[in-house]
Amino acid sequence: PRRGKYHQLTFSMDYFYRELYLLPFSHDETVHGKKTILDKLYGTYEEKFAQCRALYTYMFTHPGKKLNFMGNELGHFREWDESRELDWELLRYPAHDSFFRFFRELANLYLTSPALCEKEYNSACFRWLPTDSAEQETGGVYAYRRTAGGQTLVTVLNFSAEPLEGMKLGCADRTVLHEILNSDDVRWGGSGVTNPAPLVSFPIPCHGSPSTVRLHLAPLSAAVFALSGSPAAEQGKAWTVSGGRYMTV
């Protein structure tokens, strides 16, 4: 079970800065009876896709370069076979088409966000963030911050089967978080539990941080937030995405 294995996902950062790493989901893991990435995951048809979206969010927001074998983006159930082409016909089905579009959106976010693709080996640019969730160590709730190129992104992962309603996250004073990607968005085949309004911090200490923000996460989901520093500066301004750079307009 996933409970009790919390530190297996955090362990990678204990030795990350000693060498140069590639994060692979290669063909070796999807052949010879090992099942595809999607089919390895436990649960119903919908839960498999939800977990897969959360898994790839973790992969693309984790420091290090990525390697995904061809076909992973289709969410296929048949193992790779060198004697035939990929299962392109899967894109006719809504669940697979939604997953493909989510994968494309996630890859674009990675490629266009300095916080995700620059300074991976500068330890000052990555930090685990504590939460108040009782599920953190027993149910798989993770949060971390990536910073580079004048941009800060915060990723929150809920690998548990329980919803997180009003989860507290410690932060600096006068912090605003803007959700820029949520794996549970209905566009990607999710149930629609998102955080559409800016999350403004309030001055209640949380795990050593001077302020707190509250957010919601569906079971088996992940969200990425762009961080800004002044609620007053954000009043009356809408946020948009321009080539992956997040700016007020």
Pin down the residues of each PLM region.
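Alpha-helix boundary/capping detector
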Residues: 85, 132-133, 203
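C-terminal beta-strand-rich structural cap/linker in extracellular carbohydrate-active enzymes
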Residues: 196-239, 243-248
